[in-house]
Amino acid sequence: MEYFDMRKMSVNLWRNAAGETREICTFPPAKRDFYWRASIASIAANGEFSLFPGMERIVTLLEGGEMLLESADRFNHTLKPFQPFAFAADQVVKAKLTAGQMSMDFNIMTRLDVCKAKVRIAERTFTTFGSRGGVVFVINGAWQLGDKLLTTDQGACWFDGRHTLRLLQPQGKLLFSEINWLAGHSPDQVQ
């Protein structure tokens, strides 16, 4: 289990100066050719998402104005807060800030031939499904994960097992993503 605080994470500026990324974790760790990666991006201007051939991207708006996602004749989608949206990361997708203000989103990318991610929003205590990887990010409230207290803008990343996240207040919201490996693939093969 690895814990993180978004306010203390290193920031990578985009080459096009339209935003920045905070990488949460990758699997395998510290590998350029990852099977899955979780990150948080701040988008300050209209622009295109980076291309990642053979990957699926699930993006979830965390804060800021809605964002219009356009991909030629494939889709036009308005990204609304806390509603995950998946698309192939090897297609050109343009992001337009509809309110003209900076947006922050959670991204998870998976290799299509190896694993699949699901992204959900939780507002009550729950136990993960025992996947072979996952990430949680606290949007608000106080949550207990094992012996660790997680609050707004904090989270955790794991590579195996079931985990219970206990809401400690009457209200709270967190984003969580779990990774499931496709038949014939296992994280044990790449570590």
Curated annotation (Swiss-Prot):
Query: What InterPro entries does the annotation carry?
Result: RmlC-like_jellyroll (IPR014710), RmlC_Cupin_sf (IPR011051), Uncharacterised_HutD/Ves (IPR010282), Uncharacterised_Ves (IPR023482)
| Keyword Nucleotide-binding among UniProt keywords | no
Alphabetized, the UniProt keywords read: Stress response
Pfam families found in the cross-reference section? HutD
GO terms in the biological process aspect are: cellular response to cold
- Gene3D superfamilies annotated for this entry? Jelly Rolls (2.60.120.10)
Q: What is its induction? A: Induced by various environmental stresses, including low temperature, osmotic shock and oxygen. Expression is induced more than 10 fold by reducing temperature from 37 to 25 degrees Celsius.
Residue ranges that the Swiss-Prot or TrEMBL entry lists as coiled coil? none
User: Can you tell me which family this protein belongs to?
Assistant: Belongs to the Ves family.
The protein in question is named Protein Ves
The organism named in the record is: Escherichia coli (strain K12)
